[in-house]
Amino acid sequence: MPGYHVPISGPMMQNPYHSLGHLGTHPDQSYLHASKTGKGCKKGNRDCVYPDPPTSKSSKSKDNTSQKTSPKSSNDGEDADMDRVTNSLQTILDEDEPEELSSEERSDSQLSGSKATGSSNRNVTTRQSTESLSPDGIKESSPSVSTGGSSVTVAPSIDLNIPTDGRADWSHLPSDYQHYLNYFVENITSFHYSIMHDADDFFGTVLPFLAVQHEPLLNAVVGFATYHATLQNPAGKLQDFLKYYNKSVTLLLESINRKEMNNILNLITILQLLTIEEYFGDWINLMGHQKAAFQVIRKIFTPDTVMHTPVGRACIDWYTRYDCYVAIMGGFPTDLPREWFNRMNEYNESQLGASPDEFRWKISSRSTQLRSISYDMSMLYARGSRGQIGPEDFTKEHKRITNELLEWKSTWDAALSVPEYLVTDFSYQRDVVPGDIVNPYMLGLLYEQPLFTNTLITTEWTSIMIMHLSQSSDIPAEQVFIEMAKHAYTICQYFETVEFWPLKPKGALIPLQPCISIAALFLPRDSRHQMWVRRKFALLDTMGFIHPTTRRIKMAHLFRDPSCAHWWLPNDEGLTPILQAIRTFADERNTAAVNVQQENIREVRHLFAKMEAAELALTTGNDVTGHVLN
């Protein structure tokens, strides 16, 4: 099998479940050519400990105001929850940057109209409904709702009355905030959040509208817009983004310290900050955000109530994507139990039953089904890596999930495959060049709206198959590697199909970033394939999706080219000053992992281990399961 032979380093897998704690090793640090700064990474060196959630907490009826006026809460469970959220967020502020905006950039009197914490919100609207909602998505009926040993506190209601034109009024805000909010609605889509299907147009309409109500969220959303705008500005400065990001973090911590955790606007703020950390490749802080979001979700939602409103549905979709992704990549269980995923499926099925011809519910149903399978995968891998399941049971469950994945792929609703939405005009097709590795103009891959999600979710399914194959314990490594290589080519084809389509939605390549990163590990090692991958990685970096230092070092070792640890392309092609500044900033935040789980995620050790095991089998004639290769 020419092209796959690479020197093997590091220990091989010690058990059939590919435990993530001991797979792979760091290459020589001399591969890292990125310039060093004099500052240490305050975030990376801080040890964050996330206690297990309490088994129960007492019900309470006090509102936020009474909590704020009392120096100490009599509810120990409440204080514990607050501490968990605060601890989970403590790492995220960039302490080397100023926390306040300059007087020219921020007017307290102008922003005061938008400043709202848990107990005081301006009335707003939604075009989907004019019903009165509490910030947790539960219709107000009583001060506290019992949920089997825990309580959900109902905070004052917000009326979501979004104007018919779908635009919020932010004319009272400072000009820079207005500018970046306008940029957000014109240029940022759900795809920038790696959300492939936004059934309620949450990211396009609701999110900017909610941001105007809550200053921490406002600064997070404006910061996200500024980040993307700055990348496209040759004269852009890192501080242009950081001033909003730091302000959001500061205000969020202040809000939480005032015991205002049960506030859906704080939850959305945390999720927005979490998204920013994903762009930085900052898994240390990302996991802190995730833990904080989990604590807030379990405080203000139940599996049933979360599906009652567009805001709740968007939050749970947003959160569970991270919950499953982080769990699978790190080899540990999801935080949310299966019940939450079941309710998502049941809700979408009920909506589909009521409106069987609506594309959005068909697509939502497909998406949540795949998310539920991802949940099953994460739980199996976690049990396997911890020795909580025997080899035979692991193999049986692995096969069951394999069958579920194959069934998901083969049972698409015919309405989602209607040919009228297939892209058939490839007049933009370019000539074949020597560096090409796939045909991105094949009919049947690319759908236009409203079925464009088909193209993205099929790519995601293919990457999930690679992840699942990497955990197989009873198939010869060579066979698994060949199957993963086939899937890798498919991902590359889909990626380039979307990349070259002139009519692709804004941000359409962002959800494919994890897919192409996984595929890159299982392509041939010749210079043609390597340069193809490096160009795609460079493209994603220029979009703001930064590959962290440890990942670049791994790929430099894989490609046997130390320069990749500095930049993907020769002669710093495409490495603009602002991109270099952002990458340096991201590198500082990624200096050190604070626990084993975070290091596992940063390095995707189990995938590198599977690849190395297969290559060892090819070079020695034996695979790690004991099979002799013919």
Model-derived features: where do they sit?
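Intrinsically disordered, low-complexity activation-like regions
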Residues: 2-261, 284-630
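The substrate-binding groove and active-site-proximal loops of carbohydrate-active enzymes
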Residues: 280
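Short glycine-rich or small-residue beta-strand-to-loop segments that form or flank ligand, phosphate
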Residues: 270-277, 516-519
